[in-house]
Every structure is written in structure tokens, then in C-alpha cells.
């Protein structure tokens, strides 16, 4: 059994981002700039944003945090996004999710110009992804794919089950893996028997946020298991995932830990996406 070490792989990729940025800075170019919009006081969002900003600072990306009260109205948020869209010194815009219930997430994600859409959620970028064109990919799905590549795992011809069909992880990941030649099954809350799908899968990817939904009896021998879940165990207060790691790992050929698996890769991909958008802007 091999641990898919997202911390290690992400560290290497962050170093490469920093090296590329240093080359541009030495040529006299400005720093890349990421604008982050954070609304409300959600503790998880606060932590995620803090980690993203720290990562930016380490590689030489300038970050700008725009904080708003959870009662912000739609017009104010729309005006702020438009201002960032038109700011020539801002390369990438991140709208931290989830938004308060009175705000339409899709409307505001689509308000971000695709030229600064660091999360790859704009319809134009998603359409390019669907057709197999190079584009800005959503951070967690491309992070998972690059983690597998780092360990020379070829997904072509593999049977893969994805549990969770969100627009952020499950759906884009299914498209990307299909484009790479995998056979993908998607399971959701209405799926009658998860085990029916997971038990025959070469790779199982769980992104539900439900603690230990994936158990030993659901996995075939030598399967690869990717755990996207991040949950605080109410009893131990430790961070755990969707997968019952200690019992499942003995069956696996490869498995991601929680924490230290998918999470660090997501942050590294945010930095890479910011760099990619920056390169396009300074060429224009």
C-alpha cells in the first residue's frame, strides 16, 4: 500500500510556481495578483482562505482579501466583481464558497470574467473542459489528477466510481477522467447501492463530506482510493474523511490520507491557475 502524499507533491509543484514567478520578476514584470472575496464569518471558509493567502505569499503571488458582512446585498457584490474584472492589475478572482443563502452562487460565479476565473467555474471554461480543450480547470479535480500522475497512475481504461456530484468536484472530475479514457460511474444520494459500484472499481473517489461512508467491505483488493472529504470527528475532534482509512488502507494499492492528501493539491492548483492567468495577462 502506497500513501498518495499530497503534501509532498504539492510542495514540489509550489516550488516550480515560485521559480516561474521569480523568472518574470527578474525580467521586471509585476507580481501575479489574486483577489479573494470572503463573505460572512464561516469558520471553515476563514481557514481555507487563510491557507490560500499563506500559500500565495510563499510563492510570490500578491493577494488581496476583500471581506464583506454576510448581509451584503447582491448589487454591492456585483459592483465589486465588476470592479475586479476591470482592474488590470488583478489576474485572478476567487469567490469563496459557500455564499450566504440570499445570494445566488451561480449568478456571481458567472459574473467573474472567464479571463480571471481562477476556480474554472465559468460556463466558458467548463465548456472548454467538456470539449477537451486546454483551459482553467477546477482546482480539486485537477489536483486529484495531478496527484495520480505524480505516482504514475494511468487512468486510461480504468473503471472509476465517483461518489458525490457537485459542480465543484464530482461533475468536472467525471468529465476530465472520461476525456482521459476512463470509464466513469457517478453515484449520488439517490444511488441504491454504493457497494455495487465501488466493489468493482479500480479507483474509488469519494467527495460527500460524510464521515466513513466508504468502508472496507466496499473496496476490492488493490483498488486506489481517493478521499476528498474533510470532516471533524465529533468524538475525537480530529480531521477525518469519507473513508474509514485505518481499515480500508490494507486493501488498497494507493490511498490518500486526510489530512495531507487532496487538500494540499487543491491549494497548489489554485497557485498554478493564478500563474496561468497571469501569463496570459502580461502577454496581452
Curated annotation (Swiss-Prot):
PROSITE patterns: THF_DHG_CYH_2
Keyword flag Phosphoprotein: no
GO MF assignments: methenyltetrahydrofolate cyclohydrolase activity; methylenetetrahydrofolate dehydrogenase (NADP+) activity
GO cellular component, one term: cytosol
Family matches, as Pfam families: THF_DHG_CYH, THF_DHG_CYH_C
Reactions catalysed: (6R)-5,10-methylene-5,6,7,8-tetrahydrofolate + NADP(+) = (6R)-5,10-methenyltetrahydrofolate + NADPH; (6R)-5,10-methenyltetrahydrofolate + H2O = (6R)-10-formyltetrahydrofolate + H(+)
Binding site for NADP(+): 164-166, 230
GO BP terms: L-histidine biosynthetic process; methionine biosynthetic process; purine nucleotide biosynthetic process; tetrahydrofolate interconversion
Statement: the UniProt record of this protein carries the keyword Oxidoreductase: yes
Family annotation (InterPro entries): Aminoacid_DH-like_N_sf, NAD(P)-bd_dom_sf, THF_DH/CycHdrlase, THF_DH/CycHdrlase_cat_dom, THF_DH/CycHdrlase_CS, THF_DH/CycHdrlase_NAD-bd_dom
Keywords, comma-separated and alphabetical: Amino-acid biosynthesis, Histidine biosynthesis, Hydrolase, Methionine biosynthesis, Multifunctional enzyme, NADP, One-carbon metabolism, Oxidoreductase, Purine biosynthesis
Pathway: One-carbon metabolism; tetrahydrofolate interconversion
EC id: 1.5.1.5, 3.5.4.9
Origin: domain of life: Bacteria
CDD domains: NAD_bind_m-THF_DH_Cyclohyd
Record PANTHER family: C-1-TETRAHYDROFOLATE SYNTHASE, CYTOPLASMIC, C-1-TETRAHYDROFOLATE SYNTHASE, CYTOPLASMIC-RELATED
Subunit and interaction comment: Homodimer.
Family (UniProt): Belongs to the tetrahydrofolate dehydrogenase/cyclohydrolase family.
Job of this protein: Catalyzes the oxidation of 5,10-methylenetetrahydrofolate to 5,10-methenyltetrahydrofolate and then the hydrolysis of 5,10-methenyltetrahydrofolate to 10-formyltetrahydrofolate.
Protein name: Bifunctional protein FolD
Organism in which the protein naturally occurs: Mycoplasma capricolum subsp. capricolum (strain California kid / ATCC 27343 / NCTC 10154)
